[in-house]
Structures are given as C-alpha cells and as structure tokens.
C-alpha cells in the first residue's frame, strides 16, 4: 500500500514538473507586401521578446509571407489563414471586408493614423553622379531619359508612382487635364521595362543596368542605394509628392479561428511604440511620431505631400477610373504607342 502511494506521489510530482516546465507557444502569420522582408525581419524579434516577457514566457513565433499585396490579399480570400496583414495599399485590406467579410467595415478606425503605423512617398534612384541631371518629375519626360518601375496593373508601388506623377503634373499645369494627359503619355512612354513587382524592377535597374531612373518608395530606393553601395546610386526626392500609407489589420475571422487574437492585436499596436517606430525609420520609412522624426530631419527631405483621396477621390474610384481595363492607364499607354 505504501509502495503504491509512493508511486502515485512520484507520478504526480513528475506530471507537475512537466506542466511547470511547459511553455505555451503562439504563432502568427504576417501577410505582407513584396519589399518589406528586411523591415519585418528587424521588427519581429524584439516584439517576440517583449511578448514572452509580458506573457509568462509564452514563445511567440512570427512567420512572414511576402508578395505583391494584391496577390497576398487574394491568397487570404482563397483560404490562407494569415493572422495579420501589413500591406502598401488600402484597397488590398479593404477587399478582405468587401469580398470575404473577414474584417469589419470600420477596420481603419481601430488603430491610429487610419491604421497606418508608417508611411512613405516616392523617390528616384539615379546612377552615380546623376548624369541625366534628374531633380523633379518634369525631368522624367525628357526624350533622353529612360524609366524603370513596375506595372501599375500588378504593383501597388507602381500605382503610387503613377498617381504621384499625375498629381505633380496636375499641380504644375494648373489643373489643365489635357496638359496632364500629355505629360503622363510621355512619362509612360519613357518606361523601358514594366516588371510585375518592385523587386523585379530593382533587378532590372541595378543588376541588368537598364534605365536612367528607378522609381519606388523612398524607403526602397534608400535601401537599394545601401545594398548596391559600390555602384554609387543617388536618391532624389521630388518637391511635390504623394502620401503612401501602409495599412495594417488583424484578420478577425482568422485570429478567432487560430486563437491568436490577443497576440495579433498586441503586435500591431506595438508597431506604434517608440521602439518600433525607431526601427521603422532605420529602413527609411516615415512615421507620425514627432519625437522620433524631429531627430531625423536630415534623413528625410522636406516634400509637399498630397493624399490620394484629396486629389483623386476614394481608392475604389481611383481603381475604376485609372487601373481597370480600358481605364486612363490603358488609354495613355495606347496614346504613347501612336
């Protein structure tokens, strides 16, 4: 009897030790845009450490999925169980509500700055010494200048490039649509290669040596400049530019099914913390935290930013007017071929 009791006590002790030593594990999948790999590779480890500290040692692992954000959103609608999305265009988050009811209609009001913890604008990457003397948008329509940026039909990055060029021309031309269309026709005609995504455009410009100017997010052109330091690329930020917001959201239906709602919300809220905001600026993204930005005035040139919604209307209107089949983009491309 004493032996059996001893065995029971021993088993109970072993079980309690196993339970005490058991560390819960949580996993998040972040579905993000094509050129954000390095940014989130830097952001994820400090949050994983903070989560473990705040949650009794719970081991959190954040996995990443990267591609064009429109393609990423489609994958979620088709069943990818991403917990959070960090995209470069509002429409690619909105479609998760419109087509899948995976998030609520008011998703943009759940986090500060329209659920955009950081933003960027467009930058020009030019070759060493700026041999074509590129300083602003009007320099990009000269006949001796060849441009590289992705196809606006497949790239959110390129849609911002197109809209930024249109907005700058509209301002310069005093709202004369005919003159703006002439500018845009030549601007698009000067594109030497239309890659499908941002990384493909980088390869075309930096490794294949095509084009005089690569147009991409300010964050991306600065990181390319650092990556290909030996080539001596230079960055030019035009005077009139576009506000490119980077919206984020937790995917309600998925986090509820995955049991990850608490971690997903904490992760996206943490992106607004001073620690995260500082890391974000290390990768040349701009943030709305004045204390962080005041220390970096030399890093981010002043530029006059306009919002897509103020210049063009809502994103659904923009997509319908400019980027659907037969829209303004197709008409301008056709005009450039004539």
From Swiss-Prot:
One MF annotation (Gene Ontology) recorded for this entry: sulfate binding
Primary localization: periplasm
Origin: domain of life: Bacteria
Database matches in CDD domains: PBP2_CysP
Protein name, per record: Thiosulfate-binding protein
Pfam families the record matches: SBP_bac_11
Gene expressing this chain: cysP
Residues passing through the membrane, by range: none
Any one cellular-component term (Gene Ontology): outer membrane-bounded periplasmic space
Subunit structure: The complex is composed of two ATP-binding proteins (CysA), two transmembrane proteins (CysT and CysW) and a solute-binding protein (CysP).
Family the entry assigns: Belongs to the prokaryotic sulfate-binding protein family.
Signal peptide feature range: 1-25
InterPro entries listed in its UniProt record: Sulphate/thiosulphate-bd_CS, Sulphate/thiosulphate_BS, Thiosulph/SO4-bd
Subcellular location: Periplasm
UniProt GO BP: sulfate transmembrane transport; sulfur compound metabolic process; thiosulfate transport
Role noted for this protein: Part of the ABC transporter complex CysAWTP (TC 3.A.1.6.1) involved in sulfate/thiosulfate import. This protein specifically binds thiosulfate and is involved in its transmembrane transport.
Sorted UniProt keywords: Periplasm, Signal, Sulfate transport, Transport
């Amino acid at each position: 009897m004493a032996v059996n009791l001893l065995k029971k006590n021993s088993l109970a002790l072993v079980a309690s030790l196993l339970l005490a030593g058991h560390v819960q594990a949580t996993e998040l999948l972040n579905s993000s845009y094509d050129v954000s790999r390095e940014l989130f590779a830097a952001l994820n480890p400090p949050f994983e450490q903070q989560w473990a500290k705040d949650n009794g040692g719970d081991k959190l692992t954040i996995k990443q999925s990267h591609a064009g954000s429109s393609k990423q959103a489609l994958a979620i609608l088709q069943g990818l169980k991403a917990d959070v999305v960090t995209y470069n265009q509002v429409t690619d988050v909105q479609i998760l509500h419109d087509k899948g009811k995976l998030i609520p209609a008011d998703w943009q009001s759940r986090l500060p700055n329209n659920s955009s913890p950081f933003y960027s604008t467009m930058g020009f990457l030019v070759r060493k010494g700026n041999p074509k003397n590129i300083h602003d948008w009007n320099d990009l329509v000269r006949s001796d200048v060849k441009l590289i940026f992705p196809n606006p039909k497949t790239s959110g990055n390129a849609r911002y490039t197109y809209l930024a060029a249109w907005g700058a021309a509209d301002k310069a031309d005093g709202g004369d649509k005919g003159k703006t269309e002439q500018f845009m026709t030549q601007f698009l005609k000067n594109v030497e290669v239309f890659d499908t995504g941002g990384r493909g455009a980088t390869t075309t410009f930096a490794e294949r040596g095509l084009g005089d100017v690569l147009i991409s997010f300010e964050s991306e052109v600065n990181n390319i400049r650092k990556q290909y330091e030996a080539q001596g690329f230079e960055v030019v930020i035009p005077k009139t530019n576009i506000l490119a917001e980077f919206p984020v959201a937790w995917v309600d239906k998925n986090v509820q099914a995955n049991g990850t709602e608490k971690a997903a919300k904490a992760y996206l809220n943490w992106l607004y913390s001073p620690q995260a905001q500082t890391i974000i600026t290390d990768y040349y993204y701009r943030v709305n935290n004045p204390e962080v930005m005041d220390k970096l005035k030399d890093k981010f040139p002043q530029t006059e930013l306009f919002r897509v919604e103020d210049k063009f209307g809502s994103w659904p209107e923009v997509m319908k007017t400019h980027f659907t089949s037969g829209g303004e983009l197709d008409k301008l491309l056709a005009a450039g071929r004539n």
